Amino acid sequence: REKVQFLVASAYAPPVTTDASYTEKIATFYNNLDKLMEEQTKEDVLIIGGDFNAQIGSNNPIRRRAVIQYPALGTNGMQGTNAAGIKLRDYATSKDLRFATTFFRPPHKCCPPEIANWKNKRTIRLGGYSASTFIRDGKCYQLDHFVVCAKDFKRINYAGPVTKQLISSDHKTIKLSIKIARNLKKRWNGNDKSERINKVARKR
């Protein structure tokens, strides 16, 4: 029998700011990731879920080279990257990790607003102080992800947004479905008396 144990971690990366403390915060974030990778054993199935506050992009199926260059990404992520996303993508590639949420198409409409899991609701002032000068950004981004190791990716059945959400939040709920056991059916060896009786009863 295959021995499997799960190492599940929650992650939150600091949002990109011009504050001087951001450099220290993001360095601490990656140091914690390094420690987590070091704690992992061969038997561990590592699952990291959280808000990474980074646009990592997607492997466009038209650009085949991108699939080879960035194996950490699938073809169902949102296009567009930023500096934080490029750094995170390169880190995941170096550690042989996979952003599972970019490999699966949602069961409903697969347009960018559906793939996205965060909508910017911040108010932007265009100028002046009248109410008409304040607008909602309204842009959608894919910031929340589930990350797994490449060796365990075959266990993942689905990772992505859910169809319905019962809570009010600017973040869309995402889920990960994983295969734990291939076959739990008990094998009858013919030695158990109760099993033999049940087998005869079923034949009758």
Where are the regions a protein language model picked out?
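Active-site-proximal loop/helix segment associated with metal-binding centers of metalloenzymes
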Residues: 8-15, 70-75, 202-204
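Feature marks short, surface-exposed loop/turn motifs that line or immediately flank catalytic pockets
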Residues: 15-17, 56, 182
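Intrinsic-disorder/low-complexity, polar/charged segments
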Residues: 19-22, 82, 203-204
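Metal-dependent phosphoesterases centered on the DNase I-like endonuclease/exonuclease/phosphatase
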Residues: 28-151
